[in-house]
Design a protein with these regions (language model features):
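RNA pseudouridine synthases
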Residues: 1-186
Length: 186
């Protein structure tokens, strides 16, 4: 399958191919003419990013009407609280829209150790606990996961997209900044 690329996007990379004065861009990692992101990841988010040269496929991946499930691991401030986590599970009113219900689970201690170290490292406050949560959503509006966790009382420290549909970053063994053609559709 040579119309779909999977990139393990590093922190600080902007999701465009044109050069940017402050950030690295996709062209610094993928030099394949005609490929464009199927959805985006914020500059301060990391992980699985799909690129394609197929417009129909791009729409199937990025358009919320197709309900493609995207899985994120978020390191958040606070301690697990089921009442707050249930807010994410029911859907969150963010003011400009209400999110669809999300699947949410707290990661086991050490489960996020499979992730690479972030450069630069996140700020650590010894007096404020943090934990990792997995959030699965079928939409992907601007900064949605960060806004959802903040609204639930868990400010987001680090956000990594680990899967889109059946494409899982850990199954692919992609190092940070590496890419490969997708073995199958999401």
């Amino acid at each position: 399958m040579n119309d779909l690329i999977i990139l393990n996007k590093p922190y600080g990379v902007i999701c465009q191919f044109s050069a940017h004065e402050k950030h690295q861009c996709l062209k610094d990692f993928v030099e394949k003419p005609g490929f464009y992101p199927a959805g985006r990841l914020d500059t301060d988010s990391e992980g699985l990013l799909l690129l394609t040269n197929n417009g129909r496929l791009q729409a199937q991946i990025a358009d919320p009407k197709f309900k493609q499930v995207k899985t994120y691991w978020a390191q958040v401030e606070g301690s697990p609280d089921e009442v707050k986590l249930d807010l994410l599970r029911r859907g969150v009113d963010l003011g400009d829209f209400v999110t669809r219900p999300a699947e949410v689970r707290v990661l086991e201690e050490g489960e996020a150790d499979v992730l690479w170290p972030r450069v630069p490292p996140i700020r650590v406050r010894k007096s404020v606990p943090d934990f990792w949560v997995e959030i699965k959503i079928s939409e992907g509006k601007n900064r949605q996961v960060r806004r959802m966790t903040a609204k639930a009382g868990f400010p987001c420290l680090r956000l990594v997209r680990v899967a889109i549909g059946r494409l899982n970053l850990f199954d692919l063994n992609l190092e940070l900044g590496q890419w490969q053609f997708a073995p199958h559709r999401p």
